[in-house]
């Protein structure tokens, strides 16, 4: 790391890492059938592309879904007649009944996620490079590429890598705007923030708490080391960035215009969100909305925010450390990060972020403090506010920030430690991180570190280990090799089992012990531990990470 990296060499290394990451993701496509959310995401995007309607699970905005739908749309995938009112069913129709094959449609949709992976890697590299140098930026990017959870979720049609990528880009551009509040910086900030919010609504609180933390630090640091804040210019450029971000978010739903109410002023949740539930503004908004059609985004964005708020308020069935709960646990995400993060990244990342914070505070340098401040702000918000505890994927943004900390610490220690033994230790940690990809391939999404093994199913399940029986294809092959003619199946997922090459099967119901061949997903077991507790007496065979296979002889 004493090497003087030229800009050309640095960019070349970045390109190589990006190509490697994308190649590893693509190589897993044929291993796994569809994960739980993939059919609905594809259907939602395709209906918007084809018909200008946004129908399914509208708590999620459409940007990532649109990119997932473009490939299948160009391959001829369409929903004929009135779309199925259930998004999962509509998605299954597209996967199994399109001119292109199931594999082609699913692959084309998943390829739509790779641009977000590239944005994530480039943003992490650019942010680290700007304030920590070439060596730290490449080391950080290497750590991020070697994080199985990142590659696992980038290989699936889901919204978590997209929102992580666009939020990282927005935070980087925000710091550039802090440096110099130019109109160009404001336009870039507005565009990236709009795309982040259009990827997933969680970008709003993540960016909000990060901005609040950075502004608080800025105020404290200004008191210690006064600098010109250029307040009038900042207000103007910030207003432009805010308006542009809202316009991008609204425009992502397309040009279709709708009336938010009618002549009878039928109650509208969107209008009530925008103008209040009573008062002069409420009355005026209803009169105008009954006569003037507005872009579809004015209807859908409020519904998205209200949907997420409702979901969070009412909670979601969650599992952690053998316990289930509806409203989750404040410590869910720290535990999830502790068992889902490669140990070199976890240890070096946390220590590196702490080093960044100490150095930034001592030198009154906001830009060196920023990664640690954003990490702490987002994780604290998730712990205190979120009741939707269904996977580390909801805080994936922690990983690029940890990678920045790890990259900075490796370079700092390499330069301080002159001994070969010290350099060997650091090189060993980097190699350990990189080797994780080889040892866990292709089960990146279901990765657990040494803390979580050998029984990860006792710690986390939903979308961390089993996300809709993703190993169904592996099960099909195992049953074929064993010559199984019939079996019992306990399955929680969204594949069309009638279209899969499975032997004859019957549903495995809870509380009804049976004999013969039994296949059951870990999510099925976790959601009804009492009903399937009788299986604990038998030793299963693992099929991938999401299925248990039993053979129980009759009496």
Name what the model sees in each region.
Residues 54-112, 262-326:
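Interfacial juxtamembrane loops and adjacent helix segments
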Residues 280-285, 313-321, 451-555:
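C-terminal luminal/periplasmic domains and tails of membrane-associated envelope-modifying transferases
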Residues 336, 341-364:
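Hydrophobic, aromatic-rich transmembrane alpha-helices
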């Amino acid at each position: 790391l004493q090497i003087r990296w030229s800009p050309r060499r640095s960019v070349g290394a970045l390109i190589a890492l990006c190509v490697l990451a994308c190649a590893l993701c693509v190589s897993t496509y044929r291993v796994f059938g569809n994960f739980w959310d993939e059919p609905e995401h594809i259907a939602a995007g395709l209906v918007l592309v084809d018909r200008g309607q946004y129908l399914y699970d509208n708590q999620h905005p459409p940007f990532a879904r649109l990119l997932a739908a473009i490939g299948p749309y160009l391959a001829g995938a369409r929903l004929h007649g009135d779309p199925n009112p259930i998004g999962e069913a509509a998605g299954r129709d597209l996967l199994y009944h399109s001119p292109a094959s199931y594999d082609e449609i699913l692959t084309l949709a998943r390829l739509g996620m790779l641009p977000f992976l590239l944005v994530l890697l480039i943003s992490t590299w650019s942010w680290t490079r700007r304030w920590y140098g070439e060596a730290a930026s490449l080391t950080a990017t290497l750590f991020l590429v070697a994080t199985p959870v990142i590659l696992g979720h980038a290989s699936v049609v889901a919204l978590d890598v997209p929102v992580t990528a666009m939020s990282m880009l927005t935070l980087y551009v925000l710091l550039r705007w802090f440096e110099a509040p130019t109109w160009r910086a404001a336009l870039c900030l507005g565009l990236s923030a709009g795309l982040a919010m259009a990827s997933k609504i969680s970008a709003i609180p993540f960016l909000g708490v990060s901005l609040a933390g950075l502004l608080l630090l800025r105020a404290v640091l200004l008191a210690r080391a006064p600098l010109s804040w250029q307040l009038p210019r900042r207000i103007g450029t910030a207003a432009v960035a805010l308006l542009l971000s809202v316009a991008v978010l609204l425009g992502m739903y397309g040009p279709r215009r709708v009336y938010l109410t009618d002549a009878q002023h039928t109650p509208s949740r969107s209008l009530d969100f925008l103008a209040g539930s009573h008062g002069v503004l409420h009355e005026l908004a209803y009169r105008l909305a009954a006569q003037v059609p507005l872009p579809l985004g004015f209807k859908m964005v409020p519904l998205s925010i209200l949907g997420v708020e409702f979901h969070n308020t009412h909670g979601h069935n969650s599992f952690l450390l053998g316990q289930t709960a509806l409203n989750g646990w404040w410590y869910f995400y720290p535990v999830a990060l502790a068992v889902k993060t490669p140990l070199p990244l976890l240890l070096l990342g946390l220590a590196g972020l702490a080093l960044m914070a100490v150095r930034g505070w001592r030198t009154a340098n906001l830009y060196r403090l920023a990664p640690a401040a954003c990490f702490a702000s987002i994780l604290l918000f998730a712990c205190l506010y979120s009741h939707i505890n269904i996977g580390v994927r909801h805080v994936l943004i922690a990983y690029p920030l940890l990678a920045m900390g790890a990259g900075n610490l490796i370079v700092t220690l390499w330069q301080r430690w002159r001994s070969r033994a010290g350099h060997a230790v650091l090189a060993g940690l980097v190699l350990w991180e990189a080797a994780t990809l080889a040892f866990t391939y292709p089960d990146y999404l279901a990765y657990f570190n040494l803390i979580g093994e050998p029984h990860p199913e006792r710690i986390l399940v939903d979308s961390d280990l089993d996300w809709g029986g993703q190993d169904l294809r592996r099960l099909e092959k195992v049953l074929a090799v064993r010559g199984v003619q019939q079996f019992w199946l306990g399955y929680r997922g969204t594949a069309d089992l009638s279209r899969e090459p499975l032997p004859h099967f019957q549903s495995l119901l809870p509380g009804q012990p049976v004999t013969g061949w039994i296949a059951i997903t870990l999510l099925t077991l976790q959601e009804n531990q009492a009903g399937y507790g009788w299986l604990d007496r038998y030793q299963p065979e693992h099929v991938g990470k999401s299925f248990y296979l039993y053979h129980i002889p009759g009496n």
